[in-house]
């Protein structure tokens, strides 16, 4: 790994780092060995620089060696927003299990990057809406939800300044609360932390529990501290879903990108989305069934742990 932060660096600096990093890494990766993908700080630009250096060093066209690539050199449609899309599909399965529907649901999320934007877009498509979203500078409350042209503006705002969401409030005349997170607001149906690790600590978890909101769906990698997560799991009125299952859509579509690369095909966005939806339904199903099999009821955290452990154990046996 590395501790290089691309924030504030010039394109030339980022390119030089990516080239140097790949020069050290390329011997240990390959389409059938290990396939890195993007994450925080590693977007399409960085993947492009990394792949360019890989090709320069190897002298071959192995576009399956990295995922999250641009569409002109082997990328997949909806890969950037796949984690967010998948999280909403997982939420949809949770609601079905609880004899509920996603139609009309109000979501409070943190983050408005690729993951958060994916949640906003897919929620709007399925009849729900994100009414709260938080950024580094505070949170937005838009009772009408982030839909339509507002989704396009989020992309524009993020490209200009990813550290401030206040311009959204200024443009649409909605509430902005500076320096705060939206954990604890009561006029929502679902909480979805989708920004960074340890976003929700014990103080926030207590506010979430007190709000009376039933659904807590982790999306970012480990967005809840261990003590806060255990506290929320102990709330009888709540359903808690773990990030290790909920955010699998991103790596799932990375797998679909590799499949397209292997077959020399480019699938439509609808084809990729349908495969992603099927994938998330199955992830929820096996997690719920694993928990039930071991007498744990509808404990999705335990179910995901058990299902994941069993799959690895069976593969190693």
Model-derived segments and their meaning:
Residues 30-39, 61-62, 98-106, 290-303:
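Flexible, glycine/charged-enriched surface loops at secondary-structure junctions
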Residues 9-20, 41-45, 49, 78, ...:
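Conserved active-site and cofactor/substrate-binding residues in soluble primary-metabolism enzymes
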Residues 138-240, 245:
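Rossmann-like adenosine-cofactor binding region
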Residues 209-317:
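Adenosine-phosphate binding glycine-rich loop
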Residues 1-6, 70, 75-84, 241-253:
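Conserved phosphate/anionic-ligand binding catalytic regions in large, soluble enzymes, centered on
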Residues 69-70, 75-187:
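Glycine-rich phosphate/diphosphate-binding loop of Rossmann-like nucleotide-binding domains
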Residues 1-77, 311-316:
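N-terminal ligand-binding/catalytic initiation module
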Residues 2, 41-42, 135-140, 246-248, ...:
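Glycine-rich beta-alpha junction loops
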